[in-house]
Every structure is written in structure tokens, then in C-alpha cells.
Amino acid sequence: MATKPGVLTDWPWTPLGSFKYIVIAPWAVHSTYRFVTDDPEKRDLGYFLVFPFLLFRILHNQVWISLSRYYTSSGKRRIVDKGIDFNQVDRETNWDDQILFNGVLFYIGINLLPEAKQLPWWRTDGVLMAALIHTGPVEFLYYWLHKALHHHFLYSRYHSHHHSSIVTEPITSVIHPFAEHIAYFILFAIPLLTTLLTKTASIISFAGYIIYIDFMNNMGHCNFELIPKRLFHLFPPLKFLCYTPSYHSLHHTQFRTNYSLFMPLYDYIYGTMDESTDTLYEKTLERGDDIVDVVHLTHLTTPESIYHLRIGLASFASYPFAYRWFMRLLWPFTSLSMIFTLFYARLFVAERNSFNKLNLQSWVIPRYNLQYLLKWRKEAINNMIEKAILEADKKGVKVLSLGLMNQGEELNRNGEVYIHNHPDMKVRLVDGSRLAAAVVINSVPKATTSVVMTGNLTKVAYTIASALCQRGVQVSTLRLDEYEKIRSCVPQECRDHLVYLTSEALSSNKVWLVGEGTTREEQEKATKGTLFIPFSQFPLKQLRRDCIYHTTPALIVPKSLVNVHSCENWLPRKAMSATRVAGILHALEGWEMHECGTSLLLSDLDQVWEACLSHGFQPLLLPHH
């Protein structure tokens, strides 16, 4: 929102929320109906193609968003290092409004202007005319309109909304108040209306011009440099006709320079080109990948989780993962992504953060939960994890944390296999079990004297049970085999606090520590108001409305941890899994040992918890009933 929002700041359909697409629905239905029912010789192909073209523009913009987030994660050719936050993502979540607005105007124009009906596919003279008009009047008028928008009166009421994003993403290009978009549409309509009135318009000239605007807008705000220097060497005048991402980035960091739309010619003419333009361009081109201190190695969970990655759907990734209705419409892309990940065996960088001079990255292995459970896939997945560890070691990474199923006991003995295979590697492996156990223990209400533990037992579960028994808390199990397994791990002097519980004695236990494999029947046995606290990496399915469900082991990150603008799987905003935080703590504290394998480290739980709090990480608040 602008500093002092002016008239026509909000879009007309803002009150409709996610139902705003109903605005375009009647036109889309009408154009399709006309195309199907009209005589083939009288069909208006241009009218029919408006809606598919709008969908193409959405896809085009999304491709740019994903590319930008992918390249800026690694650091190569990144222009501005400063991170973005959830406020920026929320502010830019309505980037499709301008496509909706254009679509409505296109439909109205085709119905009102006889010249806009039944356009041919191609007219060379119309394409040349549109290009010349854009180079002259459009670029010239935009330059002065842009300068006017930087006057205090208009800037505070309108244009400051756009400049709220100092670090730009491709969609930042279209984040303006409604009034500005009206002005821009009038400006960009000049070439289109001219070709219509001169009867030189064509479907290609209309679509091509709009795609050109979208492409240049996205490129100019993508925050990584992609125009090679040799293009300007081969054709020096191109410097005046085509801007670069670093050129426009200076406008967002310096504000009073580089006003031109796409052609720097007018900044050269009027003396508003930033003096550091060429220096920044060359410096950015030479920039390599970031030097990384801590890597969190995770993987995809479900086919739909690809959209929840930071490089996926930006607004969707900014909220905890939940299956949404629109995912059914995306099944063609979901299927393609599944096929792609089947053959694409390389991990990729999904996210970067920084904290206390540490550079952090999240790497993703393109495999799903189901594939980790298949015995015949375990060797291949282990090889991928091992390659990731060796790559991190080669790059000088200090700590690598194994997230989700990358640290499975059956898969690699909680990471111990890699230490055995590569005893000389310098990177330290962390499974996060100490911190995860500490988080669960400190999530148990202070006055609790007894807890129920059930589900598939893990290293974390054994650690929690042993620690609670040592503290005098009674740990009850529902299954005899669980009781025997935990008993073998609990120190002998504390075994009196371990109980095999019958169903009749459950009423006094209001705290349940649960893992994967907890059944519906077991949940139903819990009394009303029970608090379920997961000790597993994956959340418990919430079947009881009369009970309280805690998140998986996680912590709220301190404000000094920057570039946090997406949610980690099902966790709330500004929360990180205990495994991921454990890797960061390992580097901050300078601990030299590996923290993985099957051994329990009961004596270190208080140490890791105190270190966590001292660095500003905070436990998640208990969810409201």
C-alpha cells in the first residue's frame, strides 16, 4: 500500500477475494460459445483466443518467478543480496489482477470496435508500425510519466507502493495501484489502437506486443543478470535500445535514476542514467555462486509439494502446506513434474538465508516420500544423498543437516553410513535428534507428571522417553512391543517410571507424544482435551476436534535470520524444523563432532536447548483449542 493511498488505489474486484475470476468468466464463456456456434467462415479467432492468451500470460509470469527464485538462491549473477519477507509476498500476491484487467478491456474492445473483429494472423506493416510507435511515443511518454510519478504528491499516493519492494521479483513489475495500471494501459494501447485504426493490426502483432511487455517487465525485475556482454559488443546500439536487470535494479535502490521503460536511450538523452550502471552490470556478470556455511538437505514429500517450494507458487509457499482445490486443475503440470523428477537425478538449491554472518541454503532431492519407502529405490536415494554430502564437502560447507527421510534409520542408520564411508570429510553431518528431543520435552506442559508415548519409535523417541523418565515423568505405552523397546534404552534406575498402560487407565493422561504409525483407534482412545505432540518429522493426521495438536518439532526463527518468505512444509510462518535449526546451531557454536548415528546423547539435551535460546530461536506457542 502507498504511503498515503490515493483515489483508485484498490482494484474494483478486490472485495471478491479469490472469486475475482468470475469477472472474466462470462466473456470466456461467450467467446467460446460464439466460436463453436458461428459459421466457420465468420468465426472471430481473435475473440476466442483472448482467454487462452490470458492463461498463457499467467504461465509466462510464473515461469519467470520460478527462474528468478532458482537463480537468486545460488547467488550466481544475483544483483541485490538483501532478502525479501512475507510482507512483500503478501503485497505482490495479486499480480494477476493486471492480466484480469487487460482481459476485460480486450473483450470490451473487440465487441465495441469493428476494426478489432476477425483480425488476420499476420501483417508485417502492422508489426513494424507497433515497434516504431513503441520506440518513439510510448517510451518517451512513459519516461515523463514515470518521472511525474516520482514527484512527492504522486509518489506518496501511488508509486511508493511499487517501490516498497527494494529487492525485486519478476512480478514486482506489475504491482501498482489500479490508477497507475489505467495510465499504463492507455499508454501501451497507443500502438495497438493505431494499428487498428490503420487496419494493419493482426493477432500476432497484438499478442507479440503484450508478450514483449511482459517479458521485458519480468526480466527487468528478476534480480539476476542474464544479458551476456557479447551482445553489446556485437551490436553496440543495443545498449540504448534494451535495458538489463541490473540497469533497472538501480532504479529500485537509488530511486532517482534510470527512469526509462525498456530503452535506456531516454535516460542518456535527459542525463538520468546512474553512473554505476556499467560497473554494476559487469560486476554482476562476474559473480559466482555463494560461499555456503550450512546446508539443509530435504526432499519433496508429495507430487503437489513441488508447488509449495519457494521456487513454486510464491503465495502458496508463503503459507503452511495444505491441499487446495486448484491443485486438481494443475494435474497436467503435476504429471509433467513427476516425469521430470523421475529422470532428473540432480538436487537443486531451493532457498537461501543468512544469519549472524552465516550463509544458509536448502537443497532439495527430487524424490517423494513414497520413493523413500520402496526398498528397491533405497540404494539410488542413498547415492543421491551421498553425492550431495560430497558436493557440500567440496564447496567448503561447514555443516549439513539431514531433513525429513534423508536420515532414516533403515536408509542410512541416521546418517552414520556416510561418516563410515567418508571418515576424512570436513563437513559435519547433523540429524537434529538432540534438538528435536529437546523441543518435544520443552513442549510438554511444566506440571505434567505422566505422558503417553505411541507410534513408530525412533532415535528421537527413545531420547525423549529416557530424558522424561530421568526427570521423574511417567512414560506410558499402549503397545507391549513399544514398552519392551523403550525399556531397553532407559537407564535401569529410571525404569520404574516406564509403564505399559491399559486402555482403562488413559483418562488421567492428557499429554500424548506421538509418532508416525499412530492409528485412528489409538487417537480415539485419548480423552477430551488431550494434547498431541509429535516427535516424528511428519505431522499427525488431525482426527479429533476436541483435542489439541502441536506441530512437529520446530522453532520460531529470530528476526535477524533474513530472507524468510516461504513456509517449510506444514510449519507456520517464520518457523523452521528442529533438524534445520540444529544444523545452524552446530555452525554457530563451532561444534566439531558429527551429530548422527544411532547413539543417544542424553547429557547434551540441556546444552543444545540453551544454545538454541541464546541465539534467539523460540519455541512455538501451544496451539489454541
Swiss-Prot record:
Gene responsible for this protein: CER1
Summary of the function given for this chain in its UniProt record: Aldehyde decarbonylase involved in the conversion of aldehydes to alkanes. Core component of a very-long-chain alkane synthesis complex. Involved in epicuticular wax biosynthesis and pollen fertility.
Highest rank taxon of the organism: Eukaryota
Phenotypic consequence of gene deletion: Glossy stem and fruit and reduced fertility due to the inability of the pollen grains to rehydrate on the stigma surface. Disappearance of the wax crystals. Decreased C29, C31 and C33 alkane contents. Increased susceptibility to soil water deficit.
Keyword field: Endoplasmic reticulum, Lyase, Membrane, NADP, Transmembrane, Transmembrane helix
Main localisation: endoplasmic reticulum
TM annotation in the entry: 45-65, 126-146, 177-197, 200-220, 329-349
Cellular component terms per the entry's GO annotation: endoplasmic reticulum membrane
Tissue specificity annotation: Expressed in seedlings, stems, leaves, flowers, fruits and siliques. Not detected in roots, pollen and seeds. Expressed in trichomes, cotyledons, shoot apical meristem and leaf primordia. Preferentially associated with young leaves rather than mature leaves. Expressed in the epidermis of the stem and caulines leaves, in the carpels and the sepals.
Pfam name, any one: FA_hydroxylase
Biological processes per GO annotation: alkane biosynthetic process; defense response to bacterium; defense response to fungus; response to water deprivation; wax biosynthetic process
Induction: Down regulated by cold and dark stresses. Up-regulated by low humidity, osmotic stress and abscisic acid treatment. No effet of methyl jasmonate, GA3, salicylic acid, cytokinin or auxin treatments.
Topology class, membrane: Multi-pass membrane protein
UniProt enzyme class: lyase
EC number(s) per entry: 4.1.99.5
Molecular function via GO: aldehyde oxygenase (deformylating) activity; iron ion binding; oxidoreductase activity
Segments forming domain Fatty acid hydroxylase: 138-272
Family the UniProt entry places it in: Belongs to the sterol desaturase family.
Identification of the protein by name: Very-long-chain aldehyde decarbonylase CER1
